[in-house]
UniProtKB/Swiss-Prot annotation:
One of the primary rRNA binding proteins. Required for association of the 30S and 50S subunits to form the 70S ribosome, for tRNA binding and peptide bond formation. It has been suggested to have peptidyltransferase activity; this is somewhat controversial. Makes several contacts with the 16S rRNA in the 70S ribosome. The gene is rplB. GO terms for biological process: cytoplasmic translation. One of its GO terms (cellular component) is large ribosomal subunit. Part of the 50S ribosomal subunit. Forms a bridge to the 30S subunit in the 70S ribosome. Belongs to the universal ribosomal protein uL2 family. Gene3D superfamilies: 2.30.30.30, Nucleic acid-binding proteins (2.40.50.140), Ribosomal protein L2, domain 3 (4.10.950.10). It comes from Methylorubrum extorquens (strain PA1). Transmembrane segments: none annotated. Pfam families: Ribosomal_L2, Ribosomal_L2_C. GO terms for molecular function: rRNA binding; structural constituent of ribosome; transferase activity. HAMAP family: Ribosomal_uL2_B. It comes from the Bacteria. This is Large ribosomal subunit protein uL2. Keywords: Ribonucleoprotein, Ribosomal protein, RNA-binding, rRNA-binding.
Amino acid sequence: MALKTFKPVTPSLRQLVLVDRRELYKGKPVKALTEGKSSSGGRNNLGRITVRFRGGGHKRVLRNVDFKRRENLNVPATVERIEYDPNRTAFIALITFPDGKQSYILAPQRLSPGDKVIAGESVDVKPGNAAPIGSMPVGTIVHNVELKIGKGGAIARSAGNYAQIVGRDQGYVTLRLNSGEQRLVHGQCFATVGAVSNPDHMNISLGKAGRNRWLGKRPHVRGVAMNPVDHPHGGGEGRTSGGRNPVTPWGVPTKGKKTRSNKRTDTFILSSRHNRKK
């Protein structure tokens, strides 16, 4: 979909660039596939802020998106429409099975209303079709890739994202991710063919601070703009550069400090995304 700019009638419209969503369905979602979503404002059960700079925003309704694609195997479904989803950057597709059952899936690029999609052990390499990643040919572009068999897609789910199959060996598939990381995924993990829809999301410009507030994002205050009681970078006469290596408000090194501690799955990462930056 194309990008949309506006005549600069107001200062915020001068910078505003949005994705043109005219081709999307304009009605409400299927009620049976939705549920309410309560907002926490970044607070935990004690009412204390655990995630800073969150709160407010427009009320949302959760769409139950099928990330597993393991029900109704080998049964073709018809794409009814492509919809906007406020809870993610990608678009979603409503699909209908011959028995009348409906579900939402992540909409890949080049998927249109009226198309047929299917999930099964061996399917055509066509956008929207889902299958075990081990049954797909090397070079295939995929998204919504499972890391654990049957748990549902975890990799490449945001707008414009994808991974590429670059090899197969001993029941495992080698994936190249957008970050540059190469990792092993079990061949029985499901993945969906194609790249995620809405690739132009990376080019939007919100145009004003209020549009970020509509998304539930509050102002992100820099540490050097705080007082010493609030942040290690705070204080000083006039503008200062912090006086120490960048840290979080709790003194943990940031901006490049590695925080991964899951040694159990290190063996599945063949090439780290950090290696190409050296």
